[in-house]
Amino acid sequence: MKKVLITGATGFLGKYVVEELSQHGYQVRAFGRNRKVGQSLENSSVAFFQGDLTKQEDLTQACQGMDMVVHAGALSTVWGPWEDFYQTNVLGTKYVLEACREAGMQRLVYVSSPSIYAAPRNQLAIKESDAPQENNLNNYIRSKLVSEKLFKDYPDVPSIILRPRGLFGIGDTSILPRVLKLSQKIGIPLIGDGR
Protein backbone atom coordinates (compact mmCIF):
# COMPACT_ATOMS: atom_id res chain seq x y z
CA MET A 1 0.00 0.00 0.00
CA LYS A 2 1.43 3.38 -1.05
CA LYS A 3 1.92 5.93 1.69
CA VAL A 4 1.28 9.59 0.89
CA LEU A 5 1.75 12.76 2.90
CA ILE A 6 -0.67 15.58 2.12
CA THR A 7 0.28 19.07 3.29
CA GLY A 8 -2.57 21.50 3.74
CA ALA A 9 -4.79 18.54 4.58
CA THR A 10 -7.02 20.64 6.81
CA GLY A 11 -7.67 23.18 4.04
CA PHE A 12 -10.35 23.15 1.35
CA LEU A 13 -8.44 21.30 -1.38
CA GLY A 14 -6.42 19.18 1.04
CA LYS A 15 -9.48 17.65 2.69
CA TYR A 16 -10.76 16.49 -0.70
CA VAL A 17 -7.36 15.03 -1.63
CA VAL A 18 -7.22 13.15 1.69
CA GLU A 19 -10.69 11.71 1.12
CA GLU A 20 -10.05 10.72 -2.50
CA LEU A 21 -6.69 9.04 -1.90
CA SER A 22 -7.85 7.20 1.23
CA GLN A 23 -10.83 5.83 -0.71
CA HIS A 24 -8.48 4.55 -3.42
CA GLY A 25 -6.27 2.44 -1.19
CA TYR A 26 -3.57 4.89 -0.13
CA GLN A 27 -2.34 5.15 3.44
CA VAL A 28 -2.57 8.90 4.11
CA ARG A 29 -0.71 11.10 6.54
CA ALA A 30 -2.72 14.34 6.73
CA PHE A 31 -0.41 17.27 7.59
CA GLY A 32 -1.96 20.48 8.88
CA ARG A 33 -2.12 23.00 11.69
CA ASN A 34 -5.78 22.67 12.70
CA ARG A 35 -5.95 19.78 15.17
CA LYS A 36 -9.77 19.71 15.34
CA VAL A 37 -10.20 19.48 11.55
CA GLY A 38 -7.24 17.11 11.23
CA GLN A 39 -8.58 14.66 13.77
CA SER A 40 -11.96 14.69 12.02
CA LEU A 41 -10.20 13.31 8.92
CA GLU A 42 -8.76 10.30 10.74
CA ASN A 43 -9.93 6.79 9.94
CA SER A 44 -8.30 3.40 9.32
CA SER A 45 -6.29 4.76 6.37
CA VAL A 46 -5.77 8.39 7.49
CA ALA A 47 -3.54 9.59 10.34
CA PHE A 48 -3.34 13.26 11.27
CA PHE A 49 0.08 14.89 11.75
CA GLN A 50 -0.13 18.32 13.33
CA GLY A 51 2.62 20.44 11.82
CA ASP A 52 3.56 23.80 10.38
CA LEU A 53 5.04 24.45 6.92
CA THR A 54 7.35 27.06 8.42
CA LYS A 55 9.04 24.43 10.63
CA GLN A 56 11.51 22.33 8.70
CA GLU A 57 11.70 19.70 11.44
CA ASP A 58 7.92 19.12 11.19
CA LEU A 59 8.19 18.38 7.47
CA THR A 60 11.29 16.21 7.86
CA GLN A 61 9.50 14.11 10.45
CA ALA A 62 6.22 13.99 8.51
CA CYS A 63 7.95 12.75 5.33
CA GLN A 64 9.62 9.80 7.06
CA GLY A 65 8.27 6.51 5.77
CA MET A 66 6.22 8.13 3.00
CA ASP A 67 6.37 7.19 -0.71
CA MET A 68 4.81 10.37 -2.10
CA VAL A 69 3.87 13.92 -1.11
CA VAL A 70 1.03 16.12 -2.31
CA HIS A 71 2.06 19.63 -1.27
CA ALA A 72 -1.25 21.53 -1.19
CA GLY A 73 -0.50 23.64 1.88
CA ALA A 74 -0.14 27.39 1.37
CA LEU A 75 -1.13 30.82 2.55
CA SER A 76 -3.91 31.38 0.01
CA THR A 77 -5.11 34.95 0.04
CA VAL A 78 -4.37 37.92 -2.16
CA TRP A 79 -3.67 40.21 0.81
CA GLY A 80 -0.87 40.28 3.32
CA PRO A 81 2.79 41.14 3.79
CA TRP A 82 5.45 39.48 1.64
CA GLU A 83 7.20 38.03 4.70
CA ASP A 84 4.12 35.93 5.58
CA PHE A 85 3.90 34.53 2.04
CA TYR A 86 7.65 34.00 1.89
CA GLN A 87 7.74 32.06 5.18
CA THR A 88 4.76 29.81 4.41
CA ASN A 89 4.75 29.41 0.64
CA VAL A 90 8.39 29.81 -0.38
CA LEU A 91 10.32 28.48 2.63
CA GLY A 92 7.57 25.91 3.28
CA THR A 93 8.01 24.57 -0.25
CA LYS A 94 11.79 24.57 0.14
CA TYR A 95 11.42 22.57 3.37
CA VAL A 96 9.11 20.10 1.61
CA LEU A 97 11.68 19.69 -1.19
CA GLU A 98 14.49 19.18 1.34
CA ALA A 99 12.45 16.61 3.27
CA CYS A 100 11.56 14.78 0.04
CA ARG A 101 15.20 14.66 -0.99
CA GLU A 102 16.25 13.36 2.42
CA ALA A 103 13.51 10.71 2.45
CA GLY A 104 14.17 9.57 -1.14
CA MET A 105 10.59 10.38 -2.10
CA GLN A 106 9.22 8.61 -5.19
CA ARG A 107 7.03 11.56 -6.24
CA LEU A 108 6.18 15.10 -5.16
CA VAL A 109 3.04 16.77 -6.50
CA TYR A 110 3.10 20.53 -5.93
CA VAL A 111 -0.13 22.51 -6.10
CA SER A 112 0.71 25.93 -7.52
CA SER A 113 -1.61 28.41 -9.21
CA PRO A 114 -2.40 29.56 -12.75
CA SER A 115 -2.41 33.06 -11.31
CA ILE A 116 1.35 33.13 -11.97
CA TYR A 117 0.35 34.00 -15.56
CA ALA A 118 -1.83 36.93 -14.41
CA ALA A 119 -1.02 40.05 -16.36
CA PRO A 120 -2.61 43.42 -16.98
CA ARG A 121 -3.28 42.35 -20.58
CA ASN A 122 -5.42 39.59 -22.10
CA GLN A 123 -3.63 36.35 -22.84
CA LEU A 124 -4.84 33.50 -25.02
CA ALA A 125 -3.40 30.04 -25.62
CA ILE A 126 -0.93 30.27 -22.74
CA LYS A 127 1.80 27.61 -22.75
CA GLU A 128 3.76 26.30 -19.77
CA SER A 129 6.84 27.92 -21.24
CA ASP A 130 5.08 31.31 -21.04
CA ALA A 131 5.53 31.44 -17.26
CA PRO A 132 6.97 34.86 -16.47
CA GLN A 133 10.30 35.34 -14.71
CA GLU A 134 8.51 37.42 -12.10
CA ASN A 135 5.01 38.58 -11.29
CA ASN A 136 4.39 41.15 -8.60
CA LEU A 137 0.63 41.70 -9.00
CA ASN A 138 0.24 40.45 -5.42
CA ASN A 139 2.32 38.57 -2.88
CA TYR A 140 0.42 35.30 -3.30
CA ILE A 141 1.20 35.18 -7.03
CA ARG A 142 4.79 36.21 -6.43
CA SER A 143 5.26 33.51 -3.77
CA LYS A 144 3.86 30.75 -6.00
CA LEU A 145 6.13 31.74 -8.88
CA VAL A 146 9.20 31.93 -6.63
CA SER A 147 8.25 28.53 -5.15
CA GLU A 148 7.99 26.93 -8.59
CA LYS A 149 11.51 28.11 -9.42
CA LEU A 150 12.87 26.20 -6.40
CA PHE A 151 12.15 22.91 -8.19
CA LYS A 152 15.04 23.53 -10.60
CA ASP A 153 17.42 23.11 -7.65
CA TYR A 154 16.00 19.66 -6.85
CA PRO A 155 16.28 17.60 -10.06
CA ASP A 156 16.71 14.48 -7.92
CA VAL A 157 13.19 14.85 -6.48
CA PRO A 158 10.70 13.43 -9.02
CA SER A 159 8.03 16.09 -9.13
CA ILE A 160 5.14 17.58 -11.02
CA ILE A 161 3.56 21.02 -10.66
CA LEU A 162 -0.22 21.42 -10.99
CA ARG A 163 -1.97 24.77 -11.46
CA PRO A 164 -5.69 24.14 -10.79
CA ARG A 165 -8.07 27.01 -11.42
CA GLY A 166 -11.17 28.21 -9.60
CA LEU A 167 -11.67 25.46 -7.02
CA PHE A 168 -15.13 25.41 -5.46
CA GLY A 169 -17.55 23.00 -3.87
CA ILE A 170 -18.96 21.97 -0.51
CA GLY A 171 -16.90 23.61 2.20
CA ASP A 172 -15.65 26.41 -0.04
CA THR A 173 -15.03 29.59 1.95
CA SER A 174 -13.82 31.71 -0.94
CA ILE A 175 -15.40 31.64 -4.41
CA LEU A 176 -19.00 30.49 -3.87
CA PRO A 177 -19.63 32.69 -0.82
CA ARG A 178 -18.54 35.72 -2.86
CA VAL A 179 -20.80 34.80 -5.77
CA LEU A 180 -23.75 34.21 -3.44
CA LYS A 181 -23.18 37.51 -1.64
CA LEU A 182 -23.03 39.34 -4.97
CA SER A 183 -26.14 37.53 -6.23
CA GLN A 184 -28.09 38.73 -3.18
CA LYS A 185 -27.19 42.31 -4.06
CA ILE A 186 -27.58 42.34 -7.84
CA GLY A 187 -28.78 38.89 -8.86
CA ILE A 188 -27.09 36.54 -11.28
CA PRO A 189 -27.77 37.42 -14.90
CA LEU A 190 -28.59 34.59 -17.29
CA ILE A 191 -26.87 34.72 -20.64
CA GLY A 192 -29.09 33.52 -23.45
CA ASP A 193 -31.50 31.00 -21.95
CA GLY A 194 -29.07 30.01 -19.18
CA ARG A 195 -27.49 27.06 -20.96
What residues fall within each predicted segment?
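Catalytic helix-loop patch of NAD(P)-dependent Rossmann-fold dehydrogenases
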Residues: 122-167, 188-191
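Active-site segment of SDR-like NAD(P)-dependent oxidoreductases
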Residues: 75-76, 114-118, 165-168, 186
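N-terminal Rossmann NAD(P)H-binding glycine-rich loop of SDR-like oxidoreductase domains
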Residues: 4-24
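NAD(P)H-binding glycine-rich loop region in Rossmannoid oxidoreductase-like domains
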Residues: 40, 46, 50-91, 99, ...
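N-terminal Rossmann-fold cofactor-binding loop
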Residues: 31-36, 53
